[in-house]
């Protein structure tokens, strides 16, 4: 074991963490690579902001490395690439120099173009606005606002480095545009327009991941993710509240998950299709490889259609969330085997229609607006949904796949 090998292991872990991988996946991948390099004495402490690792050389001396992990920027293609590289390493058909070179290539992997990111912001806002109950006109307006937000988000980071300030200004922009469309009678329902546009910046994934890390006893990481999601939602709520309080007095009607339109099969089908399209948008924003877009779209459609169908058959929202999340988690696991990539590629995108980020944001917004009863209701809904989704994922993760017996008869 040399210092170079340990640094390679840490670099693989750093790429995974900074790309949005969970702690357990990062630890497992590092251990797989370590065993493939023929040493069993790696001791590593992994958190979402750093990796501390110690190993022994052949002469018995210890080497220690500390690796700082930058802010998470979700890139599922990088996670998939590191996963594929780790499989090649375990097969022992690659040199140390080749591993180091490939990790450098993965770390500097190119992003989707400015055009495709704008397409993603537009489709995400329009698709999810329609999925949660807007009219076609309002969903188009949400898409236009999403497009403008995309231009803002893709350019503002060249000027500002504060995520809090970027989010506040972005939410002010969304609220201003939404209210202007309503003022000129181009739209009818401000709530669904704003919620659709907000979906592009809502922290639904960190919120659920925080609960997942809690469930795996990674309390420090869970607290960090939860506080990050809370701060993002506060920033969003502050921006919208400022616009609503100082400039406009448009009444926003609370939209609860239990009140979605499930009366018509055609309506549920069309809204689920738009949820699938919105899922594709997040596949672009999360840098999923293009060959997985169809899978993500289909799973996004299925997750929302299952939820709407189950909600139409019974009144327990959490049961609908659990069954939908459980089925999608199983489907993601099956696809991961067939496509030879991590399940997170499908799971993180296809569950997006079910994520509670919007409810979390609304709980803070209504608290700021002095409507405590509504705020508590949305806070309760967001935490229950997050726990329900996390439980469904954890259950599927701990289900052992059946062993397939090979026919040994000649």
Briefly describe each language-model feature range:
Residues 1-101, 105-107:
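Soluble N-terminal domains of membrane-associated systems
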Residues 97-109, 122-134, 149-161, 250-263, ...:
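Short juxtamembrane and helix-loop transition motifs at transmembrane-helix boundaries
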Residues 115-119, 139-144, 165-169, 226, ...:
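Hydrophobic alpha-helical transmembrane segments
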Residues 184-190, 247-265, 366-378:
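Membrane-interface helix termini and inter-helical loops of multi-pass transporters
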